[in-house]
């Protein structure tokens, strides 16, 4: 039974009557799929320990806030990937007419959207603070990002209409365009003023290039065109998560630790450089 379920998972389909326990056993029976999840749990755990050690001596409030934001990334990931590997946040949905797997129950690891909805805003908070951005731009980026993740989840869970799955996908991509605009235009200018352009541009490019991969693999995976099976898509997502989250957070936190005085001198508040703060009247 377990081998049959594992084979079904590898092909992107599972029988409708599978329980959570059976899904868990089937995931463990698919080496490619299981390894894509367990490796993230392991790396997230190591990242948490490393980041706590790296940020232990930070004293500036802005630097500490960046540290907390970066630390939240692996904390969210380890929770989410544990949910995935246990089968708790994995379901199987019958694909609508028009889908390449129409009528089949397709494995849907919707727990990934929980990861993205909680971790990617933390990445943006850290980047916004690094750029010296104001609260309005930060709020815009974070809310658009959450909208992107929620509508992406809607695309994955919609089974009533194949067309509506793609409508949700387009809406999600529209939110993504807003995030890209803030990153590439608004925050790039802010970072120049703040004097953090070099590290910001490195992290910006890393983020943009990798984040562009997520909608591409969604479209190619079982949730979209079904060109790639579930295990391959899972590894694609996991690989991008490793670089876009753990490596990103490490590079940012290392820079903040080495340049805490620069961070401390950037602003008294979001988007308010110290040099521009007028003294209070006597």
From Swiss-Prot:
Keyword Isomerase: no
InterPro entries per UniProt: Arc/bac/fun_rhodopsins (IPR001425), Rhodopsin_retinal_BS (IPR018229)
SS bond list: none
Membrane topology, Cytoplasmic segments: 56-61, 132-134, 185-196, 259-282
Topology term for the membrane: Multi-pass membrane protein
GO biological process: phototransduction
Record-linked Gene3D superfamilies: Rhodopsin 7-helix transmembrane proteins
PROSITE patterns according to UniProt: BACTERIAL_OPSIN_1, BACTERIAL_OPSIN_RET
GO terms of molecular function: monoatomic ion channel activity; photoreceptor activity
Modified residues (N6-(retinylidene)lysine): 245
Keywords, alphabetical: Cell membrane, Chloride, Chromophore, Ion transport, Membrane, Photoreceptor protein, Receptor, Retinal protein, Sensory transduction, Transmembrane, Transmembrane helix, Transport
Annotated localization: Cell membrane
GO cellular component: plasma membrane
Domain of life: Archaea
Membrane-crossing residue ranges in chain numbering: 30-55, 62-85, 110-131, 135-158, 162-184, 197-220, 230-258
Extracellular face residues: 1-29, 86-109, 159-161, 221-229
Entry-linked SMART domains: Bac_rhodopsin
Pfam families in the record: Bac_rhodopsin (PF01036)
PANTHER family per record: BACTERIORHODOPSIN _OPSIN, NOPA (EUROFUNG) (PTHR28286:SF2), PTHR28286
Function: Light-driven chloride pump.
Similarity annotation: Belongs to the archaeal/bacterial/fungal opsin family.
Protein name according to UniProt: Halorhodopsin
Gene symbol of the encoding locus: hop
